[in-house]
């Protein structure tokens, strides 16, 4: 798109927010000249590291190359001083999987049409040297709400550029959709996308994935072995041609795996009217509803964790925690979030800051409790402490669910029925008359948010109930309350969807219990029982590297952990153990990340970053020192000051981290250095390296390095 000005605000009018991430926000925008609507991804580049910024540039570069009817198109990319604007197609149809469950009719032939469009987009990407690497339901959208709208492939944040002579190393993708070669840390290329297509096609046909386990190690073992099957009765009605296509996509050996172009020529796809079954698959739709609900629940929980970590909305007015009327404890927000206490704003003193996941014990019919952080109400009593519990409750007699909101004095507010057509006497509990006006106002605001964040059908049904009850619904939530509560209300809505889909005893079962129930699918339940790893929605992008022929270039990568987790255990000892394990894992990840940053600085000849990450008295044993122990970093300045023009790419393979106490760590790894010599010839060099890190003044610095390899010559590159 050609614009007279390179300034975003000169070309576009910004409208409402469509979505939000840690460092970006997506807003609807209108082009001032044409009046066309787009979706603008606005990235705050001040918050990005150098590695993140290179990832952003790579994504924009790839998206500019791709113009296909089944790919969300990038129309404009504008870089300003503090923000980068990516202007995409405005895709209004929502997720493909959500649309399927709303259809009145869905057959194997429909699944064939869906996967055909996905394969068309992948074939186009591969023909242009692009590997997506993150194919999953969340990235499959519909162009509009119209019937028969095109499927659009989105999110090229993990995509890479390759050619037929290149292969990549690096752990990137989403666990449930990762290919065996990625998990085995073998070189990989375009076939990884076909494997993910096979997983998606399997889900499209029966509503659950081929590989599942609550334990991620066992999940990975299943994938590496290609251990999946076609259980009865749901697979009995699927044609052999569909199963054959899945088998060709889920072939463990990537060299024998079918390509996108070959898959498009399979009769089940190109002649679906003759080959694919046209029988309605109600069991698949029912199962897919539950699959979607679990995905949304995990995504919402991840959003809550992201809010508590990144947004800074958690504020506390009570550092010691408070005891609720039922005897349970609501912990201090800074303790729950793992952050320091923040001063409260005037608005935060009147309204609850954020809903926190709380594993308190509630009645058996409670699906999930979410409790607001305590706050003081200055208008009524400086000593009066209030907080709410927002939960879904399932009637034991009717199995119907509804939203229930109660405060710490056991007053009940707005038990709006959201998932059935009628409200039973059990569900029509009237609000207590003892609640204060401030409390009722907040209850109204929270209930408003729940209604607006629910699906349109739920919203209409709920608003009708409100109208019939002659309740006053003019109170709306203030902006700061909406910003803080929306992610958690999404969790509650997703939880309610699970309850309405008859996922029994979710509150009473631990994640492992649920996993065992799902694994015993054939014996215990109908084909609508879902199966999915608790980690399958977590996206990973770790230590990418390019290997092979062609021009070598320095590529930075970033570890992205969305942190989706299962249900929190109420056992203190279990929670402490999990917390300790999580902290240790996070520390190890930090060491790997800072080591990769140091290697990147060496490759880029960035002496400023190098000195920031190394202690001034760092010692080293390395071939360049001819066996001598060198102290200080000045010895290495020569390699930065030299006028080296070689293009260098460094990869850290198989890092092994040992945490030593609280302030020290050691990492050992194999370093692969790829470069072009002065004649343009490619070389690869391998060495074994270990680094000792020490935490000083809250940051990690390298205090010792030991490397084993042959000394550098004029045809190679120093690897210090």
Curated annotation (Swiss-Prot):
Expressed in the nervous system. Observed in the ADF and AWC neurons. Position in AWC neurons is regulated by microtubules. Localized to clusters in ventral cord neurites which appear to be required for glr-1 trafficking. Also present in oocytes. PROSITE patterns: PROTEIN_KINASE_ATP, PROTEIN_KINASE_DOM, PROTEIN_KINASE_ST. Changing residue 281 to E: Increase in calcium independent kinase activity and translocation to an unlocalized pool in the neurite. Small decrease in glr-1 trafficking. Its EC number is 2.7.11.17. Transmembrane segments: none annotated. The active site is at 134 (proton acceptor). The keyword Amino-acid biosynthesis does not apply. This is Calcium/calmodulin-dependent protein kinase type II. It comes from Caenorhabditis elegans. The gene is unc-43.
């Amino acid at each position: 798109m050609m614009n007279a000005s390179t300034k975003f605000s000169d070309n576009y009018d910004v409208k409402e927010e469509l979505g939000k991430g840690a460092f970006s926000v997506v807003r609807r925008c209108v082009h001032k000249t044409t009046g066309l609507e787009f979706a603008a991804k606005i990235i705050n580049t001040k918050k990005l590291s150098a590695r993140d910024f290179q990832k952003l540039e790579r994504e924009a570069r790839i998206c500019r190359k791709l113009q296909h009817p089944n790919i969300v198109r990038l129309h404009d990319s504008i870089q300003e001083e503090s923000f980068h604007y990516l202007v995409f197609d405005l895709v209004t149809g929502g997720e493909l999987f959500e649309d399927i469950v709303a259809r009145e009719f869905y057959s194997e032939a429909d699944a064939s049409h869906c996967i055909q469009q996905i394969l068309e987009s992948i074939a186009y990407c591969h023909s242009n040297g692009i590997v997506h690497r993150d194919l999953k339901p969340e990235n499959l959208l519909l162009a509009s709400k119209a019937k028969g709208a095109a499927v659009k492939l989105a999110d090229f944040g993990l995509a890479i550029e390759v050619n037929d002579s290149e292969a990549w190393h690096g752990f990137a993708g989403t666990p449930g959709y990762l290919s065996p070669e990625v998990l085995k840390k073998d070189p990989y290329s375009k076939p990884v996308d076909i494997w993910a297509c096979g997983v998606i096609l399997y889900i499209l046909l029966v509503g659950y994935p081929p590989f599942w386990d609550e334990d991620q190690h066992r999940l990975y073992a299943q994938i590496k072995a290609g251990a999946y099957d076609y259980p009865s009765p749901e697979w009995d009605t699927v044609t052999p041609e569909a199963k054959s296509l899945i088998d060709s996509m889920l072939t463990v050996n990537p060299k024998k795996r079918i390509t996108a172009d070959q898959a498009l020529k399979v009769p089940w796809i190109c002649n679906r009217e003759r080959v694919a079954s046209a029988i309605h698959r109600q069991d698949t739709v029912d199962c897919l509803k539950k699959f979607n609900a679990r995905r949304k629940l995990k995504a919402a929980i991840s959003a809550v964790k992201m809010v508590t970590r990144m947004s800074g909305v958690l504020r506390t007015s009570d550092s010691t925690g408070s005891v609720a009327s039922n005897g349970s404890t609501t912990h201090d927000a800074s303790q729950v979030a793992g952050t320091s206490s923040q001063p409260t704003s005037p608005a935060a003193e009147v309204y609850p800051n954020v809903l926190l996941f709380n594993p308190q014990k509630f009645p058996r019919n409670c699906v999930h409790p979410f409790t607001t952080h305590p706050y003081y109400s200055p208008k009524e009593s400086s000593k009066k402490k209030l907080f709410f519990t927002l939960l879904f409750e399932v009637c034991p007699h009717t199995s119907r669910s509804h939203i229930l909101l109660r405060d710490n004095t056991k007053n009940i507010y707005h038990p709006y029925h959201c998932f059935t057509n009628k409200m039973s006497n059990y569900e029509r509990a009237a609000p207590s008359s003892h609640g204060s006006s401030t409390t009722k106002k907040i209850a109204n605001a929270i209930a408003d948010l729940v209604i607006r964040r629910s699906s349109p059908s739920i919203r209409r049904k709920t608003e009708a109930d409100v109208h019939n009850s002659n309740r006053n619904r003019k109170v709306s939530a203030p902006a700061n309350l909406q910003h803080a509560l929306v992610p958690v209300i999404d969790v509650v809505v997703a939880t309610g969807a699970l309850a309405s889909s008859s996922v029994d005893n979710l509150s009473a079962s631990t994640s492992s219990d649920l996993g065992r129930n799902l694994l015993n699918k054939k014996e215990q339940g109908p084909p609508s029982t879902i199966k999915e790893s608790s980690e399958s929605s977590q996206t990973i992008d770790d230590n990418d590297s390019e290997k092979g022929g062609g021009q070598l270039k320095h590529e930075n990568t970033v570890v992205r952990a969305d942190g989706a987790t299962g249900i929190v255990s109420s056992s203190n000892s279990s929670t402490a153990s999990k917390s300790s394990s999580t902290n240790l894992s996070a520390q190890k990840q930090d060491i790997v990340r800072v080591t990769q940053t140091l290697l990147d600085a060496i490759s880029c000849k960035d002496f400023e970053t190098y000195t920031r990450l190394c202690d001034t008295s760092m010692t080293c044993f390395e071939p360049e020192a001819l066996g001598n122990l060198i102290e200080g970093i000045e010895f290495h300045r020569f390699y930065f000051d030299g006028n080296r023009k070689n293009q260098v790419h460094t990869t850290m393979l198989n890092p092994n981290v040992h945490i030593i106490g609280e302030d020290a760590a050691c990492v050992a790894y194999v370093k692969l250095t790829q470069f072009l010599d002065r004649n343009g010839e490619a070389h690869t060099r391998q060495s074994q390296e270990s680094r000792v890190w020490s935490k000083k003044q809250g940051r990690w610095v390298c205090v010792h390095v030991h490397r084993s390899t042959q000394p550098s010559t004029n045809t190679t590159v120093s690897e210090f």
